[in-house]
């Protein structure tokens, strides 16, 4: 099924980095995204998953959660009409997903960097409780901003609603008086000075420089 799904979420964050960095935040589950138009299609995917050994994790209370060989896997549709929830950037992110080579003969699809950040910003806005210090979504955002050298050029190249959303989200962050602390708490000791670099790049981005 690897070619039919896009891997998303915190489990993929290390795939976006190109500089030496500290440990990545441990994550308890793997999130995969599937493009579906109806619940009937989701039911068919469920049957396919069960045939491959996936078991519904009813105890978790999460309707899209499965387990296989002890690994927790959340299987999420792009549309919010199927399970009642979704991220607004899932559909365009799925459409523009990129290939990532894990091994020579194994390739998976992941979000492009700009859509990864958009989904994380959207998730933080919805469930971050307005505190970047304790948000795993915000931690992932900082990790990519700190460890991907081309990220700001990639963000500047975005257009339309995506660009507007990114600019608006970063503007809101810059207007928060705790932004320096929020970023600092997710940086390694040796990287503490980079909080100023990240904030500076954020400001240049929203100002269109």
Regions found by a protein language model. Name each.
Residues 1-209:
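Compositionally biased terminal segments of proteins
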